[in-house]
Structures are given as C-alpha cells and as structure tokens.
C-alpha cells in the first residue's frame, strides 16, 4: 500500500511538470523566452536544428 502511494505521487509530479512545461512553450510570446525551452521546441515540434531567444519570442534557425 505504501509503495503504490509513492508511485502515485511520482506520477502526479511528472504529469504536473509536463503540463507546466507545455504551457510555457505554448504561451512563449507572453513570457520571457527561455533558451532551453526554445531550442527544444524548435527541434522537436518544428524540425529545426536549434533556436534562439530574441526577447520575448523564440526564433528557430532557418535549416
């Protein structure tokens, strides 16, 4: 019983963290640009090599 409680807590923390990161990426134009989130967003979602911050927006590389 104790083990399932620990697993439940870890699972809920992971889900909250995932939702929070996705929210920051989606609302990037309203908050200060974060380099690591910008680069990850460009690589995974847009297929670009990298991205850089030109506050307040994230700009992906051309290639």
Curated annotation (Swiss-Prot):
Localization recorded for this chain is:
Secreted
Expression tissues: Expressed by the venom gland.
List the record's Gene Ontology CC terms alphabetically: extracellular region
Disulfide bonds listed in the record: 33-53, 38-58, 42-60
Keyword Isomerase found: no
Per the record, the domain of life is: Eukaryota
Q: Where is the signal peptide?
A: 1-23
Instruction: Return the protein name.
Output: Cysteine-rich peptide clone 2
Instruction: List the keywords (alphabetical).
Output: Disulfide bond, Secreted, Signal
């Amino acid at each position: 019983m104790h083990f399932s409680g620990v697993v439940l807590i870890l699972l809920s923390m992971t889900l909250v963290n995932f939702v929070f990161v996705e929210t920051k990426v989606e609302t990037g134009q309203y908050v200060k640009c974060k380099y690591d989130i910008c680069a990850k967003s460009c690589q995974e979602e847009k297929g670009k090599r990298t991205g850089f911050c030109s506050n307040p927006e994230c700009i992906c590389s051309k290639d």
